[in-house]
């Protein structure tokens, strides 16, 4: 056995997958999973666990896989993660658990994400469920939002015995997992829906089409409906734009809208009537995972697609795997390039985009080298569609209808990073609603921390638990074009 290199994972051929929405990565089979698990040396001081935001016992579950004990491996994972089939597919393992793997010092790290995915898929196919709480607690908790933060918080609280209800604004649960990430990366019915069923099997109730701030408010939930604590995991769904001329033209979309139409509303399926712009020449502005998702979706809808990003490939925020897949599929990367103006025809439709070439100067506040325009380097791209993928911010609806809930200048909820506690008693928050747009696993970590904080809150004397906002710590997402 080659212990230095990963067991290769099967994928659809690039030319084939570029024409369909089936999952790109086909995952390990049993033999491949056992072989890959056998590369793990089972470190006692496991750095990989330190790199996992939800602290999965990685050597523990891999040891079970090595022995072919897949159900036991699932039990180990489900102690820490409510969404293992999701995480195994979309987490940036290369910068987290796998980035800490000792095997990576001499050779390639263990394929932790692919092994997690294998175990979760095996459990689903064999109808293995997480174990519900043995004892119930007489406390009601409301969770706002059914994305990764909300599902994780709800699942952990249910395991502790709490009576948990999730309130979801959309008609379908899943948050960014269903509207933001394409089918070819994260299958909805085969994976996401089953993960949500597992959370519900713990006793969690989910109410859809409930918009907090309109249908009801946090104060009403607590004062009139008997919820003793609330977790806000409502995400960050308001898109950002550049503010350049022509941005209001027909044919300009946010990546958020474009992906929602395709992913949640199934515009890519002929049997659905959801309208979506199927451009012939498309530019996606931005360099993060969302930009890659939008570009690869537009490609599958029949377009020639350009990624326009103002820094170099080294600074691309997207996962290396996503960039690699995009290149394999034929996405054109216009790097060190920045839009100046969207060109509009006499009927108000996009006809092109004026761009300027950039070079990297001194590092800015983010630590990355600041892009600087090269004078006289302007050029035009002929286009009919522009998709802006510049990051998102939280919707202010919840904060504006909740007295005593502080937000910062970006409209992110002010919350303690250690336990999710906000400035309003009994209210906790985490995920993108606090940090701005970040990753699925970081949102899950925040949901897990908040569940622990809520448990501590409901288990103690609650005479004085209000937190001064000056003691809170906030981290901010680095958006695509910063």
What is the predicted function of each stretch?
Residues 135-136, 140-144, 196-244, 341-354, ...:
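Feature captures the FAD/FMN-dependent oxidoreductase FAD-binding
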Residues 140-165, 291-299:
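N-terminal Rossmann-like FAD-binding beta1-loop-alpha1 element of flavoenzymes
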Residues 163-166, 170-201, 206-207, 295-341, ...:
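Rossmann-like dinucleotide-binding cores of NAD(P)H-dependent redox enzymes
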Residues 433-458:
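A conserved FAD-binding loop/helix module that cradles the flavin
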Residues 467-482:
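Single conserved hydrophobic/aromatic residue that forms the stacking wall/gate
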């Amino acid at each position: 056995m080659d212990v230095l290199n990963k067991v290769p994972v099967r994928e659809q051929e690039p030319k084939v997958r570029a024409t369909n929405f089936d999952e790109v990565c086909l995952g390990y089979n049993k033999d491949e999973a056992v072989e890959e698990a056998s590369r793990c040396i089972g470190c006692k001081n496991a750095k990989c666990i330190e790199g996992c935001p939800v602290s999965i016992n990685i050597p523990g579950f891999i040891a079970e896989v090595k022995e072919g004990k897949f159900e036991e491996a699932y039990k180990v994972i489900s102690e820490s993660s409510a969404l293992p089939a999701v995480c195994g597919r979309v987490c940036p393992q290369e910068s987290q658990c796998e980035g800490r793997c000792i095997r990576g010092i001499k050779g390639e790290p263990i394929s932790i994400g692919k092994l997690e995915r294998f175990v979760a898929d095996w459990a689903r196919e064999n109808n293995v469920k997480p174990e519900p709480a043995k004892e119930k607690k007489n406390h009601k908790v409301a969770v706002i939002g059914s994305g990764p933060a909300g599902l994780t918080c709800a699942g952990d609280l249910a395991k502790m015995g709490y009576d948990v209800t999730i309130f979801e604004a959309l008609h379908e649960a899943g948050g960014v997992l269903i509207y933001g990430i394409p089918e070819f990366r994260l299958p909805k019915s085969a994976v996401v829906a089953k993960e949500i069923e597992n959370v519900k099997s713990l006793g969690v109730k989910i109410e859809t089409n409930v918009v907090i701030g309109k249908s009801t408010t946090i104060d009403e939930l607590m004062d009139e409906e008997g919820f003793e604590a609330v977790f806000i995991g409502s995400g960050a769904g308001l898109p950002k734009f550049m503010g350049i001329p022509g941005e209001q033209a027909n044919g300009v979309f946010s990546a958020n809208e474009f992906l929602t139409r395709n992913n949640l509303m199934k515009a890519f399926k002929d049997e659905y009537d959801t309208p979506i712009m199927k451009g012939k020449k498309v530019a996606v502005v931005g360099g993060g995972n969302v930009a890659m998702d939008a570009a690869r979706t537009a490609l599958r809808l029949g377009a020639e697609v350009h990624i326009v990003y103002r820094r170099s490939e080294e600074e691309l925020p997207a996962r290396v795997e996503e960039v690699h897949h995009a290149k394999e599929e034929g996405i054109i990367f216009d790097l060190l390039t920045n839009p100046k103006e969207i060109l509009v025809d006499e009927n108000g439709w996009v006809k092109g985009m004026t761009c300027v070439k950039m070079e990297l100067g001194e590092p800015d506040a983010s630590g990355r080298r600041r892009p600087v325009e090269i004078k006289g380097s302007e050029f035009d791209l002929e286009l009919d569609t522009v998709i802006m993928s510049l990051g998102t911010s939280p919707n202010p609806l919840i904060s504006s209808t909740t007295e005593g809930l502080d937000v910062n200048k970006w409209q992110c909820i002010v919350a303690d990073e250690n336990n999710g506690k906000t400035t309003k008693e009994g209210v906790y928050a985490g995920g993108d609603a606090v940090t701005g747009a970040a990753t699925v696993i970081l949102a899950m970590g925040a949901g897990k921390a908040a569940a622990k904080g809520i448990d501590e809150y409901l288990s103690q004397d609650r005479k004085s638990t209000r937190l001064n906002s000056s003691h809170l710590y906030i981290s901010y997402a680095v958006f695509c074009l910063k």
